Amino acid sequence: MESHSRAGKSRKSAKFRSISRSLMLCNAKTSDDGSSPDEKYPDPFEISLAQGKEGIFHSSVQLADTSEAGPSSVPDLALASEAAQLQAAGNDRGKTCRRIFFMKESSTASSREKPGKLEAQSSNFLFPKACHQRARSNSTSVNPYCTREIDFPMTKKSAAPTDRQPYSLCSNRKSLSQQLDCPAGKAAGTSRPTRSLSTAQLVQPSGGLQASVISNIVLMKGQAKGLGFSIVGGKDSIYGPIGIYVKTIFAGGAAAADGRLQEGDEILELNGESMAGLTHQDALQKFKQAKKGLLTLTVRTRLTAPPSLCSHLSPPLCRSLSSSTCITKDSSSFALESPSAPISTAKPNYRIMVEVSLQKEAGVGLGIGLCSVPYFQCISGIFVHTLSPGSVAHLDGRLRCGDEIVEISDSPVHCLTLNEVYTILSHCDPGPVPIIVSRHPDPQVSEQQLKEAVAQAVENTKFGKERHQWSLEGVKRLESSWHGRPTLEKEREKNSAPPHRRAQKVMIRSSSDSSYMSGSPGGSPGSGSAEKPSSDVDISTHSPSLPLAREPVVLSIASSRLPQESPPLPESRDSHPPLRLKKSFEILVRKPMSSKPKPPPRKYFKSDSDPQKSLEERENSSCSSGHTPPTCGQEARELLPLLLPQEDTAGRSPSASAGCPGPGIGPQTKSSTEGEPGWRRASPVTQTSPIKHPLLKRQARMDYSFDTTAEDPWVRISDCIKNLFSPIMSENHGHMPLQPNASLNEEEGTQGHPDGTPPKLDTANGTPKVYKSADSSTVKKGPPVAPKPAWFRQSLKGLRNRASDPRGLPDPALSTQPAPASREHLGSHIRASSSSSSIRQRISSFETFGSSQLPDKGAQRLSLQPSSGEAAKPLGKHEEGRFSGLLGRGAAPTLVPQQPEQVLSSGSPAASEARDPGVSESPPPGRQPNQKTLPPGPDPLLRLLSTQAEESQGPVLKMPSQRARSFPLTRSQSCETKLLDEKTSKLYSISSQVSSAVMKSLLCLPSSISCAQTPCIPKEGASPTSSSNEDSAANGSAETSALDTGFSLNLSELREYTEGLTEAKEDDDGDHSSLQSGQSVISLLSSEELKKLIEEVKVLDEATLKQLDGIHVTILHKEEGAGLGFSLAGGADLENKVITVHRVFPNGLASQEGTIQKGNEVLSINGKSLKGTTHHDALAILRQAREPRQAVIVTRKLTPEAMPDLNSSTDSAASASAASDVSVESTAEATVCTVTLEKMSAGLGFSLEGGKGSLHGDKPLTINRIFKGAASEQSETVQPGDEILQLGGTAMQGLTRFEAWNIIKALPDGPVTIVIRRKSLQSKETTAAGDS
């Protein structure tokens, strides 16, 4: 073994050895027996290699010699003499002589140049692999010298004679371990023919099979502005340490305006500072810290399809792993042709070595633009792409475009990546920088070859023709993954749904060819050759070539970081990398495929525990659903969901989940590989897969509602109220409310009951039924009704009469309306009344409008309808007929105000409302007889309800669903707040019952109205929501004539109404006109429900009842695009967690209506709950309310009791429970007071204790002590021990003491309003704002 110490030997001896070797090589060449000169003359070769840097010099000389030595006619002696001359010449390591010699040789015999070049290149490749020389005795052994020490030109010589053979001989000779060890710099001995090593290493020295160029881009960074692009990658990437890449270029940014930066570019330097080795956050910080002005980015732009990650991470390994196809390159970097080809300067594979020494100045670059070119015909390596005008290289004039960089400062670069070569060039020390390049004797030929290679690379990218490259990349990835990249592969597999790996394989192939069946996990049945490398290659080629595959790759890149990986995946398959690697590759491909279509929800993927089975199941399901079983798309989607499951699912979860129910979705997605449509289609499939139907159904239903939030009973209530005032609504309500309710029940039922949901959803199609109901119901709009007309009182009387007079509610329409309301109320009542049901359940049921009822939809409807019928019984039968005609038909006839008395007797507020407007009382005769035919008794009412339910109720139910769509009722904030306020289960049950009952009854009315007004629009789905809103708004507009700005309903009125009912006092009619509106709504409820409700209300203590006072449902009538007249403050992301009214604009709608006040908590807007939302989301909901012509706002005044309860509910369950405890304890003992303190620079003059997470647990925030001399001490407005409920409009429930102090600090100096709860009944100096 030669030791490295030999590297210090004199250059002369090395030169002589090289000369002798050149002579031997010449002899060997002339024999042209194809055997390696290394094998024939191992000692000289080994010796030359052993010389280290000296060897390098000699190598160059030898290269010259070998190039001539080829099949040249020049005698060996001539070569020797030339070599001697070079030796003698040699100052500066004889570089100039070498250059002259090379040129001379090229002129004398161009044919020799080719072999020399071939050898040089092969040796170069050898060097990266064999970093250390091992055994001198073995001529075929890999040279262990590090690449920097190896004289690769010489090695190239040695390899040159083997030009022909490298194609077949050397491709796979080198073991993986050897290849890995050598690049790592290990000195492990490997007995291999040098040529095989060189061939194995001939894989693109550029470090990637994709052509890429390094260039500088100057961008202008403005003040407080970015550069207009986002980045991914970093050494902390889940795929392993990778560079920083451009992910997205934003339109309108600096990068887009410049136009040179491309997505997928690797950022090497920022203002001259290297980005290598940075984590993602570090890179972001670098960009953020960059000062405004001109920024210089050094980027590597790929001219072809993105390469595999492995190529980035370990290019040398990748190259060494190249397959036999790459071997051809090793024979000569530019020559695929056999070396025996006749020597001719015109031959493109001929090369000469030229050394150029450039003088580098401090702080100035050399001006050499580099590019790496994948193997193409006879070209591969790192080349001079451009020379900057005026630069050192340009002025020197010796370097040409198309020159291949062979060595820089005595360091071979064939084993280096483009990035590494750039780093070497850019960081050279000032002074002479020797560069050895290889070029064709005619520089123009080299330049043309480079251009063609780049153009071909681009073409390959476009048409996916890089099969061999891919296979090579695959091999590279395979070996590289084994060597140090396994983590990257593993991460890919993990991220890309490892359970589906096999299927993913198949999917990749299938995805590459959408026509393939990916049912078989191993490969699509159609692509049985998938296992075969060639077929795999083709398939992979197709997949990358397909825009779908690549675009998805880009999408996956966001997740996987590098878009470049997509092509390598197929390659890995071609090269038959380990299954794991193949899978990972396929996974990457699938990701892109799936990325286009929205990924199905994770649930769907979870269901498929076995990737193959799941794939097969998906195929089966897809087949059953009529979709092709292509699992590739499915798997891709599965992978995507895993990668991007929640976002995509959130966007499409309803439909996608419906589509995803199980295997079915996957196939559908595949069939619709292009994207979302497939998912939509998958929804039917979801039905086919019962397992996921329930969840999917719910999601689908949510989709239909176009709001993921739960329906808001308050919104419905408000809508109902609007409709109540509008006779049209009441009329429409007859028909529509029942059906809409049914549809709601069905949809809700689907949500509540996954099993039942899918069919119901299918039957209803989410919205169709509702639409139908809307269509079925057509009613003329009547004049607007005042918010609290006399009919309210009458309705109260009627309600009371209802108890006394069973004929009071006979009107079938009324009964029908009450039926849905009563039914829903019954559901809510069931929820609330059932003591067994938990508050949360009640809340959820309340939010979903009796989701608990959903299981018993039919029964509940019937029971509710009969109950409503019974409730209606008390009303007059004659009225029953009228209302049935009016409401049931939703016919143009309007109620006459004269009839309000009858309406009151019937007790249907809607009817009374309709009459008040002066709408013609006479219902369509057809309907009247129908309703009349039904006996007034409960049975007839049930019949009427059933019949009307079929006609009107179905629509009514649908209308609620429409309403939900129009106003996403998915979230019922007020309901949630009440129900979530677990302070007292009684209070919440009552609130849920009342709100649900009112909401349902009102919903029936408004839904009918909206249905009548927009019978067809609701069918459109999302439009129905807006349309229904607009319709209701139109109705409201009719009402607005009487109520210009709108009206408000206080839940306390409902409470009083229930009390009035219990007391049966008619005096209350006049006293509680507003209450009567609520009472009129309640009148729709069945007597049984009312009795139960009354009983529960009786049980409630006053403190709990008082909490109802603060909740108001306000309906504002406005023009489209008009604001609501108030602004919002607070949010889950702010100190003030509760969304409150920040300011009421003087001339706005809210100010004109008068109910909404500054500081009120906003529970929901147009059915969208604001509970737990961020400030930004709340503002977005507020802006969305501009579109409809009606706005329904549920607010809660900061009354002493209502506010804390609400706050507690909004803050958290724990705080809510704590607040509930407090409220329960303090109901009889505590007094809620509002005080005003002056905030000074020193604060409010008191300290706090308690709070969430205190030493004593979650306690309310209380005043600990009052500072002496403070205004609070002098005024004695507050006392130690007082609980702070609200401070400056910010609820303090559930806050930590630190958060409370931050709120106090943030308050402006001046008067501050504080709501406190004092445990003693004596509230001396406070204003009893919360006693009510």
From Swiss-Prot:
One of its GO terms (cellular component) is extracellular space. Residues 1034-1118 are annotated as: Interaction with HTLV-1 tax. The keyword Secreted applies. The modification Phosphoserine is found at residue 922. Residues 216-302, 355-440, 1112-1197, 1234-1319 form the PDZ domain. Keywords: Chemotaxis, Cytokine, Cytoplasm, Host-virus interaction, Nucleus, Phosphoprotein, Repeat, Secreted, Transcription, Transcription regulation. Residues 510-519, 829-845 have a biased composition (Low complexity). One of its GO terms (molecular function) is cytokine activity. One of its GO terms (biological process) is immune response. Changing residue 757 to A: Reduces phosphorylation. Enhances nuclear localization. Residues 1106-1202 are annotated as: Interaction with PPP1R12A, PPP1R12B and PPP1R12C. Residues 481-548, 560-706, 732-970, 1019-1041 are annotated as: Disordered. Residues 481-495, 571-589, 605-620 have a biased composition (Basic and acidic residues). It holds the Pfam family PDZ. Residues 896-909, 1023-1041 have a biased composition (Polar residues). Residues 183-452 are annotated as: Interaction with GRIN2A. Interleukin-16 stimulates a migratory response in CD4+ lymphocytes, monocytes, and eosinophils. Primes CD4+ T-cells for IL-2 and IL-15 responsiveness. Also induces T-lymphocyte expression of interleukin 2 receptor. Ligand for CD4. Isoform 3 is involved in cell cycle progression in T-cells. Appears to be involved in transcriptional regulation of SKP2 and is probably part of a transcriptional repression complex on the core promoter of the SKP2 gene. May act as a scaffold for GABPB1 (the DNA-binding subunit the GABP transcription factor complex) and HDAC3 thus maintaining transcriptional repression and blocking cell cycle progression in resting T-cells. Homotetramer. According to PubMed:9699630, the formation of a homotetrameric protein complex is not required for the chemo-attractant function. Isoform 3 interacts (via PDZ 3 domain) with PPP1R12A, PPP1R12B and PPP1R12C. Isoform 1 interacts with PPP1R12B. Isoform 3 interacts with GRIN2A. Isoform 3 interacts with GABPB1. Isoform 3 interacts (via PDZ 3 domain) with HDAC3. Isoform 1 interacts with GRIN2D, KCNJ10, KCNJ15 and CACNA1C. This is Pro-interleukin-16. The gene is IL16.
